[in-house]
Amino acid sequence: MSVRTVRGGLLALLLPMTACVSGPDYHLPANAVAASPRAARAFVSGQDASFSHDVPPDRWWQLYGDPQLDAYVREALAANTDLRAADANLRRASATVLEYRARGAVQADVDASGTLAHAGGYTQASAAPQSYALGLHLSYPLDLAGGIRRGIEAANANAEAVAAARDQVRVVVAAAVTRAYLQVCTRNHTLAATRQVLAIQRATLEATRRLAAGGRGTDFDVSRAGAAVNRSAAGIPHLLAERQASLLELAALMGRLPADYPREAEGCPQPPELEQALPVGDGWQLLQRRPDVRAAERSLAAATAMIGVETAGLYPQITLGASSGVAGTPAHLLSADSFGASIGPVLSWHWPNRRAAKARIAAAGANADTALASFDGIVLRALRQTETALSACTQELERERSLAQARMDAARAAGQAQQLYRFGRIDFLDVLSAQAALADAESALATSRAERVDRQMELFLSLGGGWAAGDTADGAIR
């Protein structure tokens, strides 16, 4: 039997394997938490009138209707250092995909050699025999068991997971920029309110001094009024420091040096308000939108594909090879006898020791189970975070409404106290108490507004919007 016949018979035996690909085909497991209909329902904590069931817009920060904020987010998404690092990670993952694809392509090798035989003694070098060889070798992996295809599938899924991680950075950056800008505006509003209360207290202090000078007041009253002024004034440096910290954070997020912080933001008089009910969507939309969920799902797909990569190790690896070359002395290099060529399959098979391959398959299956557990955990965390953020936002809005009413009542009481004191109906301690209550109400309301901004940012961060504001991968869970 000729070598050609043996090779042909071997190919005929192994060609049916081309219809099979090792390992399981990936699909979202039926027992995954994300596949449960209960995970797709409307949010339990999203029934307040301040929320709507509309799909959140991707550029959710535009709901505030502030062009300056929109410009800051755009700049940050273009220049943020964390995003630049995430983009580099994505390029590296894409290069890995190209590497895996190249493994299934034709490989070419060229070799050349020359020899010079030299006999010992007094033999002249010019008389030494010389020979040369030049060869071209081509090889193409047939990938009958599908190991290379599964490797490409795993590399693609890993690259998509890295893209999702990049998208998560975009979400975090957009939320951080919005939070920092709104904090600057909130601090400015609090500063204005504090200075307004301080102006009232200083006017009271001056009036008290005049009364004491005219014999209608005491030094004790002057001291108490001065203490109230100093107590309110002491809060201003802290507010200024907090505002500056937010401005510097904003600069860093935008990729600027501290000296180049956006000074125009210092003039924001108060935080912009949402112009409509906050759209939150439902659970199904959330899981489709959140990049961390997508990254976990793509990691599960990659782990599933790796089972096929390891399963392919149970089967022979067939490479179709072809070689052509020329060899001989310089005088005979162009003769017919110096040429040679061959073509045929090359078989590589780790057999009979299959226990190692089966152990690797078992390990790959365990990795897939780990990836599924991680995916389920991230889905549960996404739903929990969103429900928690919705509840916290609802309660903080209610708290702010109550504190706003309390501030109005305190301002009215402070004005009435001054009038009553002027007519001798109450003593000076009551005036100071009313003004202290107003200062406390202003402080509590400012704190609540800052908390409400933080709660809204946590909610938007939980909803996962903002990653599609630039080029990105498809966000759908497979």
Which residue ranges define each predicted feature?
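Charged, alpha-helical scaffolding/interaction elements associated with membrane systems
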Residues: A79-N80, G214, F423
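Surface-exposed, polar/charged faces of alpha-helical domains
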Residues: A78-T81, R384
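Terminal intrinsically disordered/low-complexity segments used for targeting and assembly
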Residues: S2-A78, Y132, N156, L240-Q288, ...
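Repeat-solenoid scaffold signature
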Residues: A213-E242, A444
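Small/polar-residue-enriched beta-strand and adjacent coil segments characteristic
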Residues: S22-D25, R59, G65-Q68, Y72-E75, ...
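Amphipathic alpha-helical coiled-coil segments
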Residues: A85-Y100, V169, V173-R210, A227-S232, ...
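Residues at or immediately flanking beta-strands
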Residues: Q107-D109, D219, E249, D260, ...
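Amphipathic alpha-helical interface segments used for oligomerization, scaffolding
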Residues: R7-L10, L211-G217, G235, R256
